[in-house]
Amino acid sequence: MKDLTMLLDELKDMSFFNKGDICLIGCSTSEVIGEKIGTVGSMEVAETIFNALDVVSKETGVTFAFQGCEHINRAITIEKSQYNPLTMEEVSVVPDVHAGGSLATYAFQHMKDPIVVEHITVPCGIDIGQTLIGMHIKHVCVPVRTSVKQVGQAIVTIATSRPKKIGGERAKYQ
């Protein structure tokens, strides 16, 4: 997928991926192939996307988390090494193509030691196909603009975050 490679290269050039961070991926493989979200799914597309992200992870030190679909309440597949019991709650579900989505399913099958958590708060994310990842992005969510607007037929939305500005008119900010 040339557009995926271009998108990831552009984000690397922008220093979007930071070593030690967790970047959330939401993806409708149905949308990537031009179908309605949640209808046909593609493990082949999931494999391509997962493998491209794995390369980015090795190059930059970022870790990826994978959002499941609404049928599993948009739960997140992560490596167990990223699990923090103080801020995350593990849930008992295994993503499936028809309840979790193809990419979360593929990730669960190919990660070293995957677990699924109910919620996560991450500093950045890539939404491929309007899967609504915003509920897992740290406040304050900030859109990131790139020249790549789609992966396949799916609309891409990218977000990062910044600290909240609090204190009112007398406050000073960095």
Swiss-Prot record:
Cited Gene3D superfamilies: Hypothetical protein TT1679
Pfam families (alphabetical): DUF436 (PF04260)
Top-level taxon: Bacteria
InterPro entries, per the entry: Antibiotic_NAT-like, DUF436
Similarity section: Belongs to the UPF0340 family.
Name of the protein described by the UniProt record: UPF0340 protein SAOUHSC_02355
Taxonomic source organism: Staphylococcus aureus (strain NCTC 8325 / PS 47)
